[in-house]
């Protein structure tokens, strides 16, 4: 199917290994479209070429991959989340909206909507080269039971997503709300190379940008928000998992003076070792991200990988750093964390490491999730407040 509507050209239907639309009838289909880092639901009339958004952002601003199913000519199921709605299975009926309902939520926890901070989509223009837009979502602190003392700015946690060809949207995330309800601002950095902003932005990290542009983007946002008086200049931290962990280490080697602390989860510290031991699916991914188009000889490749590996630049890290890693991680082997911790410890730096037995790459087991949150909050309390 090839549908061209002029008014839809600014939106993206593409999503890797996912079906982003479902025909309901001969004249109507439902689609999940991407724009400014989020994915929204629309209904499209194929006969009149008209379309409209089905739900507001509070209900649906993120749609899971390959997660729509037709029920009838007018109704369908979808897995989605909104700015104040957790990930849920929902039923929508485009002809009878009063029959829309939530079938099941991913969590049984319920909190008053007044407690939730909503993400503000943010775009700044880089000051560094190449000149480019940089995107993010910013959640400011919110808790109706507490007010910050006058003149006090909140500390900021910058979170870099994994991938690196991925993104973070503005859907409700209770981990984010955990920190915003405790007085922290949180920035989800959709650095150069993220999805959700068009092909040019997505491809801009390839062929030599990884480890430089994404790290620069974090520093640009830290400086921007501090200069604008929105966050505490000496209370900014960086964190991320997987490629976001790599970003964390790169940021601390390049811009340590800007960041009060870092938390690296399942991150890469030495690219050559990683390239030789990661799983088959991503075995050529690093080369495409790091090497110029057309390739280079082995000596140049080895030199470039070393330049982009935090393990060889630990002397630049002045900020406290905690590394979390699963012992059974098959994507980024645990030695990536232990090598980094050993080298920093030998230099007398403030470093901690937690290796979780029986855990893999994504830290998904409930005990690991709890320990991760505890270690993170402990670090921020010590370094940001």
Can you annotate each of these PLM segments?
Residues 189-385:
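Active-site-proximal cap/loop segments of hydrolase catalytic domains
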Residues 25-27, 73-74:
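Conserved loop/turn motif of beta-propeller repeat scaffolds
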Residues 20, 30-31, 77-78, 123, ...:
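Structured core elements
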Residues 23, 35, 43, 83, ...:
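Alpha-helix termination/capping residues and helix-transition junctions
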Residues 81, 94, 162, 241, ...:
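Flexible loop residues that form catalytic
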Residues 5-12, 16-20, 32, 38-40, ...:
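Non-catalytic accessory segments flanking enzyme active sites
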Residues 106-234, 241-242, 276:
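Cap/lid segment of the alpha/beta-hydrolase catalytic domain
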């Amino acid at each position: 199917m090839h549908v061209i509507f002029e008014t839809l050209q600014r939106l993206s239907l593409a999503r890797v290994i996912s079906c982003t639309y479902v025909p309901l009838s001969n004249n109507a289909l439902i689609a999940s479209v991407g724009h400014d880092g989020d994915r929204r639901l629309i209904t499209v009339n194929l006969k009149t070429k008209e379309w409209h958004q089905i739900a507001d952002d509070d209900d649906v601003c993120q749609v899971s991959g390959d997660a729509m199913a037709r029920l009838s000519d007018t109704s369908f199921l979808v897995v989605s989340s909104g700015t104040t709605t957790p990930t849920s299975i929902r039923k929508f009926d485009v002809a009878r909206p009063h029959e829309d309902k939530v079938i099941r939520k991913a969590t049984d926890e319920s909190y008053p909507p007044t407690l939730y901070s909503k993400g503000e989509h943010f775009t700044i223009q880089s000051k560094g080269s190449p000149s480019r837009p940089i995107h993010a979502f910013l959640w400011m602190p919110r808790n109706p039971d507490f007010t910050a003392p006058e003149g006090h700015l909140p500390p900021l946690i910058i979170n870099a997503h994994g991938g690196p060809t991925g993104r973070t949207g503005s859907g409700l995330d209770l981990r984010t709300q955990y920190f915003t309800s405790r007085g922290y601002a949180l920035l989800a950095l959709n650095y150069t190379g993220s999805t959700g902003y068009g092909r040019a932005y997505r491809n801009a990290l390839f062929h030599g940008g990884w480890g430089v542009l994404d790290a620069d983007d974090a520093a640009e946002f830290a400086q921007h928000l501090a200069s604008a008086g929105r966050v505490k200049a000496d209370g900014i931290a960086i964190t991320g998992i997987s490629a976001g962990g790599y970003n964390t280490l790169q940021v601390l080697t390049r811009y340590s003076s800007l960041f009060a602390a870092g938390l690296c989860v399942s991150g890469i510290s030495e690219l050559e070792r990683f390239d030789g031991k990661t799983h088959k699916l991503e075995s050529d991914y690093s080369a495409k991200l790091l090497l110029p188009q057309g390739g280079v000889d082995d000596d140049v490749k080895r030199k470039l990988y070393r330049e982009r590996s935090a393990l060889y630049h630990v002397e630049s890290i002045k900020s406290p750093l905690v590394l979390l890693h699963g012992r059974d991680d098959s994507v980024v082997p645990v030695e990536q964390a232990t090598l980094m911790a050993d080298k920093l410890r030998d230099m007398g730096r403030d470093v901690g490491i937690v290796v979780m037995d029986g855990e893999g790459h994504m830290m998904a087991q409930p005990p690991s999730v709890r320990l991760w949150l505890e270690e993170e909050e402990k670090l921020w309390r010590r370094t940001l407040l």
